[in-house]
């Protein structure tokens, strides 16, 4: 029972880390990367699909993404979807390919994005701490039901605290990397 609780708690904490990585990947730095457009949805014959299902996304250079649709009539829809996404990008339709230049970030915008990164990190830390609280509550309930001893509870709480510390440290590391990425010119 205790090992199952630890395992499920660790899996949930890992999901929090994965969600943070996904959220951080959406935050635009000055450098282009193909994952930046992953969440852009395009209308394709009446249904909304991810952009990577209707186009090939490549890097043209360090500051430009190239989007080549598989069907030429989709160029306009893909261009509109990129323009309408919340990344502040201005795509240029070149006839065969859509060029998406990455505008340079201003100092003020970098600071704003750093605040957003910290906020995302704090949300992830709160999620990890809530998982710790839930696990500890399960342990207390098990002691109350006399399923486990108090010694097992204390040992398990220590293990869960170590897990929490490990994942909070990983969150801090991810945040530091993203902030450093944002501040590079």
From Swiss-Prot:
Q: Which coarse location class applies to the principal site listed for this UniProt protein?
A: cytoplasm
GO CC, any one term: cytosol
Subcellular localization: Cytoplasm
An annotated GO BP: cytoplasmic translational termination
Q: Which CDD domains match?
A: RRF
Concerning Pfam families, the annotation shows: RRF
**InterPro entries reported for this sequence:** Ribosome_recyc_fac (IPR002661), Ribosome_recyc_fac_dom (IPR023584), RRF_sf (IPR036191)
Gene Ontology molecular function: ribosomal large subunit binding
Instruction: Report keywords, A-Z.
Output: Cytoplasm, Protein biosynthesis
- Give the family from UniProt: Belongs to the RRF family.
Chain's role: Responsible for the release of ribosomes from messenger RNA at the termination of protein biosynthesis. May increase the efficiency of translation by recycling ribosomes from one round of translation to another.
Question: What is this protein called in UniProt?
Answer: Ribosome-recycling factor
Q: Which organism is it from?
A: Azoarcus sp. (strain BH72)
């Amino acid at each position: 029972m205790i090992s199952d609780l630890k395992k499920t708690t660790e899996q949930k904490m890992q999901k929090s880390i994965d969600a943070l990585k996904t959220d951080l990947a959406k935050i635009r730095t000055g450098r282009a990367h193909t994952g930046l457009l992953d969440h852009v949805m395009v209308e394709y014959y009446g249904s909304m699909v991810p952009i990577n299902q209707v186009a090939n996304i490549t890097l043209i250079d360090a500051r430009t993404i190239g989007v080549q649709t598989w069907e030429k009539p989709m160029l306009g829809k893909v261009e509109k979807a990129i323009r309408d996404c919340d990344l502040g990008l201005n795509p240029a339709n070149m006839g065969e390919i859509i060029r998406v230049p990455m505008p340079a970030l201003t100092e003020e915008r970098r600071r704003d994005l750093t605040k957003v990164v910290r906020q995302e990190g704090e949300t992830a830390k709160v999620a990890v701490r809530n998982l710790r609280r839930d696990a500890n509550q399960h342990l207390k309930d098990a002691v109350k039901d006399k399923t486990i001893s108090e010694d097992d509870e204390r040992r398990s709480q220590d293990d869960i605290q170590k897990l929490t510390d490990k994942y909070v440290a990983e969150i801090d590391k991810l945040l530091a990397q993203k902030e450093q990425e944002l501040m590079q010119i």
